[in-house]
Regions:
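Small/flexible residues
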Residues: 5-6, 36, 59, 69, ...
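Generic detector of short, locally flexible boundary/turn motifs and exposed helical patches
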Residues: 57-63, 69-72, 154-160, 169-170, ...
């Protein structure tokens, strides 16, 4: 029974690992909206909130109530395209006065690959089609295109933080002002105002085209859009994300992120804020590392635009890694509870109650060993030692079940002649239950340890999937604990240790042919799965099984283990006769 249950859990693990990629690949996806065909969408008012102005009214330049329409602005345009660089210890940003946009956003402390170059967060392939960071979104596509292609007049106070840079444009009808303020953190203060014939028009700063570390289909699949109001974080499912769909406020922050990096916008006025969700498609090489591979994959690129529906926009913008320390340093007014900051953008999943403490514990261990691989090894040893009583309980439960197995078989033979619908079958179950109670047998006692151990494995899988600290972290021969083992030593170790565990663990009551099949099928199946898993997870898995082998060997030498072995040999001899 235990082996069948283990198979069920293993198959469940397969489903969890493969569900999201299969969903994206095989289920029909809504067509990506074409920029040239986008239609203005009206934000919907939330309950207990006054109706918001329609997109058409906002775009048409309706003056803000109580304000006079200003005179037409004088011309202010640059003659040629030029670039300006702003940097601090964390990033180096290159602006172009063409649209007042960001051409590159380089994070100095992160690499594009192990021992590679500093990572550029601008996804150039997607940005070339759907827009660069810090361009402006308006509900009028024609106006939007003009805003993001005009040549702005640039002014800056310097190239090193603290610094400010501004972009201005006017042509007698349209007047645009954008300014950015930088300090020594990942936060940028953004101000934007657009007027058409003196009437304010809503224009939202954008992060429209994913991130520069996205090079594979799985990396794009990890993208998500989320926002937080009060203590509640809402994560939008892919099917709810459209090109230009509006989520009206109030909310304290809204962000787009991938596995390791995020762009989060904090509106100055949460009540009048609105979030525009962006989703487009591009084609990328199926195997980016293989220059001869001509196969292309279609992937979804996510983005956001956040601003005020009532005149000029003032926001703070966090662009950087999804480290808990960096996100915690950004205080957000209006959020209640224990975390009034941006840590909600990190999604530990439905096992977050286990995954997050595991990660904090892993970080604490890292402070003392200074290597993430050895921190995983130490944590795995402690977890398995803590679960040792469960292994002992499982063996005791199996032994008790085998002791009463002949009596259970006799009861089943007694009622064998009755059909399943016969009331007598109920009496059989009552007799078996009475026998269990008399002998102190818990029929699910052998399953309980598995039920407790599996969430730890799933939580570890989820935790390592969002822990940027393990990105490009090395251990012995492994160059990146967040990526698969390049020479497959860890997956092979999983196969070998699983096979040994199968051989050493008592398999009472199982048919020899079935036992032989399981001894080979389970290691082969789990080994196949592990070939594409992160090395950090494979290390945890293989190390856990290695410790399990030592524990199982010790249990097999105990009186309990000897009794179990003798009972199995006795039953095997009876079957041979």
């Amino acid at each position: 029974m235990e082996r069948r249950l283990l198979l069920v859990f293993a198959l469940t693990f397969v489903v969890i690992l493969l569900f999201q990629p299969l969903l994206k690949k095989y289920l029909p996806q809504p067509p990506a909206p074409k920029p040239e065909a986008a239609q203005p969408q009206s934000p919907q008012a939330l309950p207990d909130q006054a109706p918001l102005p329609s997109a058409a009214k906002v775009v048409s330049g309706t003056p803000v109530a109580g304000k006079k329409v200003a005179a037409a602005p004088s011309n202010k345009q640059a003659e040629t395209e030029a670039e300006t660089v702003i940097e601090n210890d964390l990033y180096k940003i290159t602006f172009s006065n063409r649209g007042g946009r960001v051409k590159s956003w380089i994070l100095k402390k992160y690499k594009d690959k192990p021992n590679g170059q500093p990572l550029d967060l601008v996804n150039s392939a997607a940005a070339g089609k759907y827009g660069y960071p810090l361009t402006l979104w308006t509900y009028d596509e024609g106006l939007r295109n003009k805003l993001n292609s005009a040549l702005y007049v640039t002014a800056s106070t310097g190239t090193s933080a603290p610094a400010e840079i501004s972009f201005d444009y006017s042509d007698g009808e349209l007047a645009v002002h954008k300014s950015y303020k930088f300090d020594h953190s990942y936060i940028v203060e953004v101000h934007a105002s657009v007027e058409v014939n003196g009437a304010p028009v809503s224009a939202f700063p954008m992060w429209p085209s994913g991130f520069g570390d996205e090079t594979t289909a799985s990396a794009y699949a990890a993208g998500q859009i989320a926002y937080q109001y009060d203590a509640n974080v809402e994560r939008l499912a892919m099917k709810k994300i459209s090109g230009g769909g509006t989520v009206p406020g109030p909310f304290q922050w809204a962000g787009v992120s991938d596995q390791y990096f995020a762009a989060v916008i904090i509106p100055g006025n949460s009540q009048s804020a609105a979030l525009v969700t962006l989703r487009n498609q591009i084609e990328i090489p199926h195997k980016p590392s293989d220059k001869n591979d001509k196969q292309l994959d279609k992937v979804d690129v996510l983005g956001i635009a956040v601003g005020s529906l009532k005149g000029p926009t003032a926001v703070r913008m966090y662009v950087g890694p999804k480290t808990l320390e960096s996100l915690q340093s950004v205080q957000v007014p209006g959020i209640t509870g224990a975390e009034p900051d941006l840590r909600g953008i990190v999604d530990f999943g439905w096992l977050g109650l286990i995954a997050r403490p595991l990660f904090l514990w892993l970080k604490w261990t890292f402070k003392y060993v200074h290597n993430w691989g050895w921190a995983i090894v130490i944590q795995t040893i402690i977890i398995n030692l803590a679960l040792l009583p469960l292994r002992l309980s499982q063996m005791k439960s199996m032994l008790k079940m085998q002791r009463v197995a002949p009596q259970i078989k006799a009861i089943q033979e007694k009622y064998k002649k009755y059909s399943l619908r016969d009331p007598k079958k109920a009496e059989m179950n009552e007799e078996i239950s009475a026998l269990y109670k008399k002998e102190g047998v818990n029929p699910i006692g052998g399953c309980l340890p598995l039920l407790i151990q599996m969430p730890f494995l799933f939580a570890y899988y989820r935790m390592l999937g969002v822990a940027i600290d393990l990105r490009h972290a090395t251990w012995l021969w492994v160059p990146d604990l967040s990526a698969p083992d390049p020479i497959y030593i860890l997956p092979i170790a999983i196969v070998i240790t699983m096979f040994l565990m199968q051989r050493m663990t008592p398999q009472a009551g199982m048919d020899p042919a079935q036992q032989k099949m399981m001894n080979f099928m389970m290691p082969a199946m789990l080994g196949y799965i592990s070939f594409n898993l992160a090395s950090g997870l494979c290390l945890y898995w293989a190390m856990g099984q290695l410790i399990g082998i030592v524990q199982q060997w010790s249990l097999n030498q105990s009186s309990l283990g000897r009794e179990m072995r003798e009972m199995m040999e006795k039953r095997a001899r009876k079957k041979e006769k």
